[in-house]
């Protein structure tokens, strides 16, 4: 999609192994005239997560954090732009949160960019340039308060790590199920797994639904199963799945 608006260089990829790992991004071949380096920090389809941010060699880092936002503490000073839809961990679909370094909020944008697609438009209008999705924002506020009551992002991270460990430990020991991501790059939010038999995968999803487990079918592009264990999923839910 980005190629519609400018030149794009793919600096690193794990396509060679079905995106089952995060490639080494410590010494990327970044062109001098690059405007920014972009990553999707957590891949919901393949279940991978950047545990270490790329070395952008001074270039601005832009990150889509839709599926890992507020799942753990983040040093925002390492980014130029952090953005994402709230529908995974914060609130209902239809709201987007963007955290932008102030020097990047300018009128210096691609020629032809519509007014309402400029960050500066919304920053200047305090996010009220057009009618905001008030109810969605209200729900986000309730979630923020809930997060604080849980002990903040440090406590949420600890709980998310505990949930993920329960599931990954089971998969690593199982003779039937197998995780699809190398251990060091595993997501805390999305856990894909397979049996190695498509018919058996389908049977598992069907039987799991009867047992009260919804949406365990993997993304249509990869198949298998996927357990999404976002902030709202209690530890008990993961324990029940393992049982």
Where are these regions (language model features)?
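Conserved PLP-binding catalytic core of the aspartate aminotransferase-like
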Residues: 177-208
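PLP-dependent enzyme catalytic core of the Aspartate aminotransferase-like
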Residues: 210, 219-243
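Active-site phosphate-binding strand-loop segment of PLP-dependent enzymes
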Residues: 2, 14-69
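General beta-strand structural signal in soluble alpha/beta enzymes
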Residues: 10-13, 39, 61-65, 83-85, ...
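A short linear hydrophobic-aromatic micro-motif
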Residues: 176-180, 212-218
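Conserved active-site segment immediately N-terminal to the catalytic lysine
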Residues: 62, 76-87, 96
């Amino acid at each position: 999609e980005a190629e519609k608006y400018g030149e794009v260089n793919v600096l690193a990829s794990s396509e060679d192994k079905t995106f089952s790992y995060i490639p080494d991004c410590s010494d990327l071949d970044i062109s001098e005239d690059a405007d920014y380096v972009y990553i999707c920090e957590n891949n919901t389809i393949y279940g991978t997560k950047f545990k270490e941010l790329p070395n952008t060699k001074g270039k601005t880092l832009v990150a889509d954090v839709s599926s890992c936002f507020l799942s753990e503490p983040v040093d925002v000073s390492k980014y130029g732009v952090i953005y994402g839809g709230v529908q995974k961990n914060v609130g209902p679909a239809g709201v987007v949160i963007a955290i932008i370094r102030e020097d990047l909020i300018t009128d210096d944008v691609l020629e032809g960019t519509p007014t309402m697609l400029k960050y500066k438009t919304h920053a200047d209008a305090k996010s009220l340039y057009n009618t905001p999705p008030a109810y969605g924002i209200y729900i986000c506020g309730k979630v923020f308060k809930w997060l604080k009551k849980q002990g903040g992002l440090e406590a949420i991270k600890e709980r998310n790590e505990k949930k993920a460990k329960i599931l990954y430990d089971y998969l690593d020991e199982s003779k039937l199920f197998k995780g699809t991501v190398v251990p060091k790059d595993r997501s805390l939010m999305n856990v894909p797994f397979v049996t190695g038999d498509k018919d058996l995968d389908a049977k598992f999803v069907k039987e799991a639904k009867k047992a009260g487990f919804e949406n365990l079918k993997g993304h249509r592009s990869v198949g298998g199963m996927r357990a999404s264990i976002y902030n709202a999923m209690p530890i008990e839910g993961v324990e029940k799945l393992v049982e």
